Every structure is written in C-alpha cells, then in structure tokens.
Amino acid sequence: MTLKELEIGKSAVIKTVGGEGALRQHFLDMGVIPGAEVTVIKFAPMGDPMELQIHGYELTLRLADADQITIEQISSRTRKHEGARNINQSVHPGLGEEGKYHVKGDGNPLPEKTRLTYALVGNQNCGKTTLFNQLTGSNQHIGNFPGVTVDRKDGPIKGYPDTLVTDLPGIYSMSPYSSEEIVSRNFVLEDKPKAIINIIDATNIERNLYLTMQLLEMDIPMVVALNMMDEMTGNSGSVDVNGMEAMLGVPVVPISAAKNEGVDELVRHALHIAKYQERPGRQDFCSENEFGGAVHRCIHAVSHLIEDHAEHAGIPLRFAASKIIEGDHLILQKLELDENEHEAIEHLIVQMEKERGLDRSAAIADMRFNFIEKVCEKTVVKPKASRERIRSEKIDRILTGKYTAIPCFIGIMLLVFFLTFHVIGAFLQNLLAMGIDALSNVTDRALTAAGVNEVLHGLIIDGIFAGVGSVLSFLPIIVTLFFFLSLMEDSGYIARVAFFMDKLLRKIGLSGRCSSDLDVQFRR
C-alpha cells in the first residue's frame, strides 16, 4: 500500500521511501523517513496534492511522490510527540553560561576591532526577518547573492558597528535541494561567519531542530534563539531551556522577536560566543548502542578516512562525513578523494546499510530525528492549539475546501480588482488627477503672466504636466493593487492558493509555487 492510497483521517507507518536524488533527500530531511507515523489531513480540491501530519507538523506532498512511499496502516499511534509533562523549571543562566551547559571558550578573545560576522539561519515563517529587523533596525543593505536571484540582506547590530548580520533565506536543511539551501550552505562554508544565530519557532521545535543539528555539525560558534515563546507559554507550553542547552551544547535564549523580548540577551550571547569562539559542545547525535551502533561506527570511520581532505577543503569534518554518507555529490567533489578512498568509504556505508536495515540517506535522517525526539521528550511541553490556530483551521476549511476553494479565490480576486479599479484606486486616481490639473492651471497662469516663450510654455504644460501627469495617474492603481496582494501574501492566503492550484498550474508546465510569481506579475 502506498501513501497515495491512504484515506483522510487515517494513520500509517512509513515502510520505504522511493525516488532518488535531491528530491528524495529533501523528503527525508522533512521527516518522511521509514518508521515515521503519518496521518492524512486532506486533499486539495482538485485531488492533488495532499496535506499530511508527520512528526507533529503539516507537510504537503504531491500524489506522484506519495505513490513512491510505501506504508503500513495502523489504528493507533506508534510514536509519542506530546513531550514531557513535568520538565525542570530551572532559571536560565547568565552570560556565557560559564561552561556549564556547553564548552567554554579558551578565554582568549579575538583581537579588538575584529569584525564579528553572523549568519542568521532558520526555517521559513519562524520570525527570522522580524528578528533581523530588531537586530539591525533601519541600517540594512539589500542585494542578491552572487550568481542567483536570492535576496541577501546585511546589517550591523544596533549599537555595535563592528558587527555584520547576514539574513540568509528561510530553509529546512543544508542539503542542496533548492537555490536557497545551496546559497545558505555556501555562505556558511565559504564566507565562514564568526558565529551563527539559529532562530527556531518555539511552537514547532521538532521541525526546526533538524536544521539546528546540521548547523551544529559545522562546528561554528552558535546561539539558538527560541522565538515565539510568548505564544508557547500563552498556550500552556514550556521549554526547559537549560535542559535543551545541555543536550545541544550551545546557548539557548527564549525570545519574542515581534515584542522585542529577550533580544538584548540574545545579542549579548551572540557577541560573547563570537568574541571567544565558543564552538558547539556536541556534534555526535548517534548512540554507540542505538540500533547496534551501526550509524555511529560508520560516521566515525568515514570521519577518520576523510580528515585530511576535509581540513584541506575547509569543510567541517563531522558535516562532511554525514554528507558523504548521504551521497552529497557537491561535498564529494570538494574533498577530491582518490579511487581507493572512495571504495573504502563505500564499503563502510554498505556495511552500515546491512546492519541498520536502512539505506544510507534514510539512516542519517532517522538518526537525527531520533535525537530530536529525545530532546523534545525531555525538554518540551507542546502548547495547546491557540484560538488563532483554531480560527485559522476553520477558515482553511472554506478557503481550501473541495467545493469552496475555487469560488472563494475567484470572489477574492474580483473583490480586489473591483476595489482597486472602481473604488479605492479610482478615488485616489481622481484625487491625484485633480491635484495635477490644479497645479497645471496655476503654472499655466504664472507662465502666461511672466511672458514665457510659447515653445517653453507648451513644453512645460503640454509635455511635462500632460505627459508625465498621465503616467502618474496609474500610480494610485498600482499602489492599491500592491497593497491588497501584499495583504493576501502576508496573511498566508497565497500559500493556500499554491496548495489548491498546483495541479492546474502543472498542466501548463508550472507549479503551485508560481502563484506567488503570478502575484508579482499582477503588481507590475
């Protein structure tokens, strides 16, 4: 039985994940791994794609991809995701942690005036841009990463001119699946920031920690910012911050970027770890005894074989070893291994696959999610569904419903165009036209009274005011349309449009994600 055949509301355990290449690795990174429990929430109005719940969060999958995933249907849950119910309510320690919860720096700070560079990394929709704005204020530089159209934003931390924070694109892993992931990985590996600020959505820790584990493997000083803690605690959730620090080996700071709470403490930690180069205290997430220790032995053996190559290529050893086992061809190219080394590593990986009972990519992903589950069980009490989320789910039933999604979309777009071209936009357009006409009349009388040459007079009145004025008359329409479409995008409606329009757009060679690009074309 495949995942495509699973009915709405039914649960199953994933047995195998088909496919190959970067797309399959992307699914594994998102938690679609053998042994994981998955529940079908709904199908798009056109029947494709489908929305799933896995590891406590929602995921959208096309039916063609779901057809490559075999499952075993179950009647009860097999994995617990509720987290601990009685966690330690310890007081969060002070600056630098004094080496209590992660490896303390050697006490030799970087030279004075050294520019402290930071990579701000996190999943999409975790509040990363809000935090970046809180850190840098209005002092930002916006551009593109070299060779791609991915936006790049840089700016110094307010009050600290010798710092520079780079806001990397929102990503879910450091695998080379999308241009955003490639750009982010290359920035960390090649630009070598002094430290990483990893922002996590506290209401969805399980999903966010996968990227955190990959960042820890890069052996760069790092501080974790638990964002949206106000929502977490406001809905009866909590996090044992000290316990999480002890398990991750890096400082963890609870914040609310939207309310500017905890940001000052985050800045102090970020400055401290960068200045003293306090590297993560943990990079080994697989137990020697777990599943016979097959993955543990393989990672350490591969690390030993590639140590010199990784150092020469400037790639963190643990990260390189994990990526080689996963089959990351870009990392393999950079290491420049000879044929004998390739054969030795392949022998180790094949042996691990036999002992573990999973293929190489799935074994590494499963190792990470097993550790994440342990962290959440020991340190996290998941919040209850907030009133906002319950209200959002009710609205979703209408906006993405089988029989209501398309009519709602047509109705909303008609309303937007009506308000733009006949109400708000038209009113502002008439107001601007009246202003231009009034200014033109005043200027006309002034030029006539001054006896200005007729040619110059005609150029100003008939050329500038009439010509430029007619072009400017479109500005209110454009601004109004931009406002409404931005409102739709910020509210999350465009993402919902991508969900139910994906099948239709693919018939003309596009994907559902292009709905946001079509949105931009409307703005133009």
Question: What are the roles of these predicted feature ranges?
Answer:
Residues 347-381, 386-396, 430-472:
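Interfacial loop/helix-cap signal at membrane boundaries in integral membrane proteins
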Residues 1-80:
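Compact, glycine-rich, soluble single-domain proteins
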Residues 158-160, 183-252:
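Conserved C-terminal guanine-recognition region of P-loop GTPase G domains, centered on the G4
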Residues 90-173:
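Conserved G1/Walker A P-loop phosphate-binding module
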Residues 232-287:
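Canonical P-loop GTPase G-domain recognition
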Residues 282-359, 363-373:
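Long, well-ordered amphipathic alpha-helical subdomains in the mid-to-C-terminal portions
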